[in-house]
């Protein structure tokens, strides 16, 4: 095996997806603890806690105890290199979350055992389904009251349309939580409370029919054996091929807060999740083991370092190797760059990088020329596909408090839009500026960042827009007719693309009916 193939085989790049408060930040920290990337898990005990989660770094996140931006963390585990992409998990997140899922090879879904499948999880699973991303499931909070585990598995199957195969099964819950039983290995992992902040060797009992198992389970033993028979009869057996095709999810149980069950999840990602996969470009399919370097930008982050007004482009390497000082071609602007200062991430800790391989995420310093969806190569003209803009779900009109600052406002919004913090629309019929977002909090984030970073104060007003659609039409005359007739609702987005701002769902349906030659797109590829 070549060095290149060996390095690719070692990589696992995945994201964590969950509904707010399902325990995603806690499991992130415990995964880092497993990889010994942090010495002690600084758990976020409450939203007012002074100890901030390692992966929450922007000012607003510190105040609210939520991870707004997508952090990237790399750590070694069992002779593999793990790239973990943390995604915003609070009520209102952004397109960033959706786009992060285009840069990974698998995902870990965290569910609250007391609540089951929640709305945000459904939305994220829809995005995973676009690329048939393999999903590992972790049912969390076993140290509290949870719903019936069989019911939870049924819900995963019914709501998320994916087969659920339990790998471990919980023994009791809340005050009676004794641990989990590994079905295939016939082994009990014993839960020892009080070790949430450290790695311990989990006691293991081999064989459910052993005297030790009977003693540990006590009064729960007979009921558990009975339940297990039911589980084995009713549930799917794990099939790795079905998992790799995105049709089946292996399910684990545990408590992230108690640091229990997380190591089994990480072992599953190493043993079963795919190494970096091939990637489609407009021109051809790129294999990760190819020698030449290629990669695409899926996120831009401003201000990672309060000391510098910098912007970092997050790039997923698709093939080849990054070496410090190498020449790269920025395909969209047809420019060759010498990159000597790429970064690797550990949340807000940043280190200069000597080398990186397919599957890794690196940071490039960006002085305003790099945009989301940009491809970098060693000279080949390539454009990777599948990094879309998603139609916003919420809209606000921007009002400037100081009219003399309109230039700074436009510059700030342009930069924040390129970074994916918001989408900007300029209606043809007025001088208004309309912002679009996927969650309400994005508007707060934009306002506070305009104030902090661009010294611009703005307010928002309600606007009569239900949704946005990007317009395409092969017939130029029809397109011109459409623009005249629909003038009241036509806008240009921040990237210069023609957009229709529909005031209502009914209006959009009528327009689609009246103009069959015009395509109203809910997503737009980055070009």
From Swiss-Prot:
It comes from the Bacteria. SUPFAM superfamilies: EF-G C-terminal domain-like (SSF54980), P-loop containing nucleoside triphosphate hydrolases (SSF52540), Translation proteins (SSF50447). It is found in: Cytoplasm. GTP binds at residues 18-25, 86-90, 140-143. One of its GO terms (molecular function) is guanosine tetraphosphate binding. One of its GO terms (biological process) is regulation of translational termination. Increases the formation of ribosomal termination complexes and stimulates activities of RF-1 and RF-2. It binds guanine nucleotides and has strong preference for UGA stop codons. It may interact directly with the ribosome. The stimulation of RF-1 and RF-2 is significantly reduced by GTP and GDP, but not by GMP. This is Peptide chain release factor 3. It comes from Azotobacter vinelandii (strain DJ / ATCC BAA-1303).
